[in-house]
Amino acid sequence: PLDGSRPTPADNSGYFDHTPQNIGMDFRRQAITMLESMGISVEFSHHEGAPGQQEIDLRYADALSTADNIMTFRLVMKQVALEQGVQATFMPKPFSEHPGSGMHTHLSLFEGDRNAFYESGSEYQLSKVGRSFIAGLLKHAAEISAVTNQWVNSYKRIWGGSERTAGAGGEAPSYICWGHNNRSALVRVPMYKPGKTGSARIEVRSLDSGANPYLAYAMLLAAGLKGVEEGYELPPGAEDDVWALSDAERRAMGIEPLPQNLGEALTLMERSDLVAETLGEHVFDFFLRNKKSEWEEYRSEVTAFELRKNLPVL
């Protein structure tokens, strides 16, 4: 619905569900056919964990081409949805009781034809460049969050309580850490496949489906390359379920939280030389003004939660 009323999921299917009554099967088929006719390759697709939630993974490309493909992808999804009588949304968390939608991004850094993230014999086959790149992402994660997670609703996905409950299937990172195959970490180092040196990579899991890919990828590259240029040391990895740890345990491991809301994220962004230098004065100032206005509008909104909880008893 476009009037702000509560939406209804297009189906009640679950993770990897392939039952015939799953509307997503035909939706994905039609969408992928259209994407590939436009030269945008798709590697995988399946139903995700939440009702009505679909995952379509685009094949890798350089950063700018990937951002272009994402913008085209979003338009295609919305067009196909309209043709099928449903609405596609990239809102990070449209349902409080279901997991949100991320834009998990796999990336590698190349010097010519050589994958600069790969080093034979090192831990996880991850090079010093790769380790410093991750360190840069972690060190600057909080201050770039207003760009990588730019909506009020983005922080409902990051901090949504239902995503921590058993079986909810939510995998949005709330804390700044990295790990090997750890889906609770902000940065994950996938398992290396022998002989696939070109595919050595990292996965950034904080981005959500509503992010501006041009700005978000610019900030990921700036933060990572800052780590490489200045030789940041990578802290120890987290292999435990970070969500299950206590605050004291996380503090002992040096693991800090991401911003709790857009207001916190904007405060950190406003103080950030890295974000200002990367975006440039015009974009930096415009982005801040626009997002501060959105945050102030949200803060003054009387929500359905307040009416439900307070109106009958106060």
How should these model regions be labeled?
Residues 1-314:
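Glycine-rich, acidic/polar active-site loops that bind/position phosphate-bearing ligands
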